[in-house]
Design a protein with these regions (language model features):
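Single conserved hydrophobic/aromatic residue that forms the stacking wall/gate
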Residues: 1-13
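Transmembrane alpha-helices and adjacent helix-loop boundaries
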Residues: 11-201
Length: 201
């Protein structure tokens, strides 16, 4: 049966090749649109959904990681335990950023999709895997963008906020992050474009 089906499909492909070979360029384009136009539109829609959702999730991850990386260490007020925990968390986040920025997305996709099933016995669907992989990858890139955006804000503004009694969280939300967000907007657009192209992986 398989041989019959394969021969049948082979005959269909041969007939299509013969038909297409006798067409000029524009006729071929029109023929492909008529035959596969619905598939192209479906694929484009899937690409946009994955890229938009994953970029949004990746930005959220990037903001969280970037903010944690820029938390200052208060040597006088912070307890020893808090210093140790913060240092360990920063090291883990730095490893995450370096690994996901330094390896190709195809390698990450293979490791997460197949590795999760083999190591943790977790079976993920294609959509779940796509969102997870692109989001985590985007988060690593956005983390550095957020960190750079926060650092680029004049340190005098942080000192001024602390001088009037603002906590670190208040300083970030009211003074630093609004300016940092404006600085990293172009990078968010760049990551969206990259994700649109990288969904082919």
């Amino acid at each position: 049966r398989d041989d019959v089906e394969s021969r049948g499909l082979g005959d269909v492909y041969k007939r299509q090749d013969n038909v297409i070979s006798n067409m000029n360029f524009w006729e071929r384009i029109l023929y492909l649109l008529q035959e596969y136009g619905t598939s192209y539109l479906k694929g484009a829609g899937t690409t946009l959904v994955i890229a938009l959702v994953s970029t949004a999730i990746g930005c959220l991850i990037g903001f969280i990681v970037g903010i944690i990386q820029t938390i200052p260490e208060d040597k006088q007020r912070d307890s020893l335990l808090k210093k140790i925990v913060l240092k360990i968390v920063k090291i883990i986040l730095k490893i995450y950023v370096e690994v996901f920025r330094g390896t190709p997305m195809i390698v990450q996709a293979v490791f997460i999709y197949y590795g999760a099933a083999q190591i943790f016995n977790i079976q993920m669907g294609m959509w779940q895997s796509a969102f997870l992989i692109v989001s985590i990858n985007t988060g690593a890139y956005m983390a550095e963008s957020v960190r750079g955006g926060i650092i680029s804000v004049d340190p005098g503004q942080t000192e001024g906020a602390k001088a009037i009694g603002m906590t670190h969280v208040q300083t970030m939300t009211n003074v630093i992050l609004p300016q940092a967000f404006r600085n990293i907007l172009p990078q968010i657009g760049n990551n969206l474009i990259i994700n649109i192209k990288d969904t082919s992986v």
